[in-house]
A protein has these predicted regions:
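Acidic two-metal-ion nuclease catalytic site recognized across multiple nuclease folds
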Residues: 2, 145-150
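RNase H catalytic domain
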Residues: 14, 18, 58-147
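Short, conserved alpha-helix that lines the donor NDP-sugar binding/gating region
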Residues: 53, 57
Length: 150
């Protein structure tokens, strides 16, 4: 598989108030770690932190489809890196999801996964996810809904 077919996406979701105003951020990188594009957006609904983490993955999957096109995404291997061990473990099928709202978000991710060759989720330390976190805070501070081509 060529490097062009492997992507790393750092995601973060955050809520001020938990639940409260929420936003998501995503940093798309090639396999070597070179940034390709950054995204962030304020969420319309008030969310918890965990819901915002799920929404960040959903947001990123949709942005990847737009960025690469549906045909290319079918040969794309994506590793999501996030600082929420709970969400990464739930998305990898290691933890059960008890809350109905979270189950609905899981199903959205599951359905979007079919557009890609392979997707996995990795929990990383918060320090390694700083840029995605910054994007969330920028959105919440009113500088949101941006796309940056790097």
């Amino acid at each position: 598989m060529s490097k062009d077919n492997k992507i790393i996406v750092y995601t973060d979701g955050g809520s001020r108030g938990n639940p409260g105003p929420s936003a998501v951020g995503a940093v798309v990188c090639d396999e070597s770690g070179r940034k390709i594009k950054e995204y962030n957006q304020v969420l319309e609904d008030i969310s918890t932190n965990n819901e915002a983490e799920y929404e960040a993955v959903i947001f990123a999957l949709k942005k990847l489809r737009q960025l690469f096109g549906k045909e290319k995404t079918q040969s794309l291997e994506v590793q999501f890196r996030m600082d929420s061990q709970l969400i990464a473990s739930q998305l990898n099928g290691e933890y059960r999801i008890l809350e109905e709202r979270m189950q609905l978000l899981f199903v959205k991710v599951w359905n979007l996964k079919f557009d890609f060759k392979k997707i996995n989720f990795k929990s990383i330390p918060r320090e390694q996810n700083k840029r995605a976190d910054e994007l969330v805070n920028q959105a919440l501070d009113g500088q949101g809904e941006s796309e940056k081509l790097l």
